[in-house]
């Protein structure tokens, strides 16, 4: 298996991206192609990583984080993200991982690979740690404006991802709303509620913001604007709680003693709240495998995103997703 990694994408590229790729190749034993400026990548690579597992594919352009996604992808055909998806399209890679401009990554994926038949809008799905296991939040930034049918398709695609990659049987699907009662929310959400209710999905109704992590639903559907805000609010809250807990522990001798004896517990606690653990968000609905990472991803996050890409390919999620979309529309 070969994973193409956009080495120039992200706030800390190429250093952190290369470090994450090395971790993935060493631990997973897979082939990785680092796409980007070969000189910059070689400096960071420095002969590290298992011999023969990491290669470099040079390209001369990079899509910056603040560039217009569609314009950049169309004009910069030699950019690292565009070239990475070209490798996938031409059979020289099995998946693409990028921590770069998420809009450009989505655009490059759709332009280069195309959409699964029947899918109107590909979406970003994020598997976060809930009270009773993983919870898939979809969409987390791919589509800020959605029609009700798009939300229905998000649920169908996430259902395929959950059953194949997370091993969930008939996962519970809910729609993010401002109240639990049927009839709540704006017109978009109310109409999507009816579509989801009539679908073969295991629909459990509305999910309030405070219930995202509760386990009421294992798949939470929303538009990309709300989903991105919810995800980043959770990330910020997790960082704040971890920071304040550490400050409180270090403020007294009793706290320091507790921190010393309970450090393994606190490490596990911090791990459940660290966005690096979920690595990235798969783009569901494209004819291929693409994983979008946080722009500020650490080496651990890049490694985990690469592992997610491997799981996606090995579990044949794309085939299952295509089949479920066709079945649900029949």
Model-derived features with residue positions:
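N-terminal charge/polar-biased segments
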Residues: 1-5, 11-15, 31, 42-44, ...
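Short, glycine-rich nucleotide/cofactor-binding loops
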Residues: 5-15, 142-152, 292-298
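Short glycine/serine/threonine-rich phosphate/pyrophosphate-binding segments
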Residues: 13-17, 78-91, 95-109, 116, ...
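N-terminal glycine-rich anion-binding loop in soluble enzyme alpha/beta folds
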Residues: 15-67
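Glycine-rich phosphate/diphosphate-binding loop of Rossmann-like nucleotide-binding domains
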Residues: 15-16, 28-33, 38-42, 144-209, ...
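Phosphate/nucleotide-donor binding subsite
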Residues: 49-93
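Glycine-rich phosphate-binding loop
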Residues: 87-106, 184, 189-195, 199-270
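Glycine-rich phosphate/nucleotide-binding loop
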Residues: 110-123, 127-137, 219-220, 224-330
């Amino acid at each position: 298996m070969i994973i193409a990694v956009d080495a120039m994408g992200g706030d800390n590229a190429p250093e952190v991206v290369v470090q994450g790729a090395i971790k993935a190749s060493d631990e997973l034993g897979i082939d990785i192609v680092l796409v980007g400026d070969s000189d910059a990548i070689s400096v960071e690579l420095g002969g590290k990583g298992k011999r023969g597992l990491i290669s470099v594919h040079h390209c001369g352009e990079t899509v910056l984080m603040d560039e217009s996604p569609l314009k950049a992808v169309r004009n910069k055909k030699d950019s690292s993200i565009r070239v990475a998806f070209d490798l996938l399209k031409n059979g020289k890679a099995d998946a693409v991982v990028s921590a770069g401009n998420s809009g450009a990554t989505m655009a490059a994926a759709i332009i280069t690979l195309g959409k699964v038949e029947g899918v109107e809008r590909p979406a970003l799905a994020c598997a976060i740690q809930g009270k009773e296991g993983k919870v898939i939040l979809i969409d987390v930034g791919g589509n800020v404006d959605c029609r009700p049918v798009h939300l229905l398709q998000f649920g169908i695609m996430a259902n395929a991802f959950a059953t194949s990659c997370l091993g969930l049987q008939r996962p519970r699907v809910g729609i993010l709303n401002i109240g639990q009662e049927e009839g709540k929310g704006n017109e978009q959400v109310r109409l999507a509620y009816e579509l989801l209710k009539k679908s073969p999905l295991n629909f459990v109704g509305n999910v309030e913001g405070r219930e995202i992590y509760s386990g009421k639903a294992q798949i939470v559907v929303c538009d990309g604007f709300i989903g991105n805000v919810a995800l980043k609010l959770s990330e910020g809250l997790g960082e704040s709680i971890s920071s304040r807990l550490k400050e409180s522990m270090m403020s007294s001798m009793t706290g320091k003693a507790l921190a010393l004896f309970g450090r393994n517990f606190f490490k596990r606690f911090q791990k459940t709240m660290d966005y690096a653990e979920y690595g990235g968000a798969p783009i569901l609905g494209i004819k291929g495998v693409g994983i979008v990472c946080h722009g500020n991803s650490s080496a651990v996050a890049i490694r985990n995103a690469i592992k997610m890409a491997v799981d996606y390919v090995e579990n044949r999620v794309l085939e299952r997703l295509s089949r479920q979309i066709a079945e649900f529309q029949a």
